From Swiss-Prot:
Species, as recorded: Pseudomonas entomophila (strain L48)
GO cellular component term, pick one: cytosolic large ribosomal subunit
Subunit and interaction comment: Part of the 50S ribosomal subunit.
Pfam families: Ribosomal_L1
Name of the protein in question: Large ribosomal subunit protein uL1
InterPro entries: Ribosom_uL1_bac-type, Ribosomal_uL1, Ribosomal_uL1-like, Ribosomal_uL1/biogenesis, Ribosomal_uL1_3-a/b-sand, Ribosomal_uL1_CS
GO biological process terms, semicolon-separated: regulation of translation; translation
UniProt GO molecular function: rRNA binding; structural constituent of ribosome; tRNA binding
Length: 231
């Protein structure tokens, strides 16, 4: 059995395995634990009562968190004409068509979100092998293929998170930076869960939100007592 590091021992001494924590208690406890040498994020994992093997039970969406994620988001937009001007005015870091595609094929992929207007998909479609593995391929289901690229840029910059159930029916996303006020962090999580409930698959039976777990980037996951959330 691997030997625990000093940091792991210090963390193990402070947490109770299997305990369901009040949200504010969990957030405060996680923030008090020994940290990595960078500003960690708060991450949420939500176990859903869905069968991800069934296409009609795959949960996929995007939502703008009321207090953002604390991250600086770089956005590239494929569009042209007046929409290009609107995207730049909304804060896009790069706007283009074939020129932008050439840059990305050449390895310039320093973006967190890629957005496209429908008429630009003829160009974006050639980038599937480049953008797909990085989770950057624009998709109408999460609002990144849209004629209203300006609003999509504003949402991305405001802290919109995108998520999709994994093979175990769990969604994972960042909900803020360590250092966020617990109240603001809680409101971000509540907004996310409200969105999950809004798009609950009609064929999902039984308990839908089965478990909510809060963690930091390098820290342990703490089970959240859902009664401490206003959802």
């Amino acid at each position: 059995m691997a030997k625990l590091t000093k940091r792991q021992k210090a963390i193990a001494e402070k947490i109770e395995a299997g305990k369901a924590y009040n949200f504010e208690e969990a957030a405060t406890l996680l923030a008090s634990l020994p940290t990595a040498k960078f500003v960690e994020s708060y991450d949420i994992a939500v176990n859903l009562g869905v069968d991800p093997r069934k296409s009609d039970q795959v949960v996929r969406s995007a939502t703008v968190l009321p207090h953002g994620t604390g991250k600086t988001v770089r956005v590239a937009v494929f569009t042209q004409g007046p929409a290009a001007e609107a995207a730049l005015a909304a804060g896009a870091d790069r706007v283009g068509m074939d020129d932008l595609a050439a840059e990305m094929k050449g390895g310039d992929l320093n973006y967190d979100v890629v957005i496209a207007s429908p008429d630009a998909m003829r160009v974006v479609g050639q980038l599937g092998q480049v953008l797909g593995p990085r989770g950057l391929m624009p998709n109408p289901k999460v609002g990144t293929v849209t004629p209203d690229v300006a609003t999509a840029v504003k949402n991305a910059k405001a802290g919109q998170v995108r998520y999709r159930t994994d093979k175990n029916g769990i969604i994972h996303t960042s909900v803020g930076k360590v250092g966020f006020e617990a109240g603001k962090l809680k409101e971000n999580v509540e907004a996310l869960i409200a969105d999950l409930k809004r798009i609950k698959p009609a064929s999902s039976k039984g308990i839908y939100v089965k478990r909510v777990t809060l963690s930091t980037t390098m820290g342990p996951g703490l089970i959240i007592d859902q009664s401490s959330l206003n959802v």
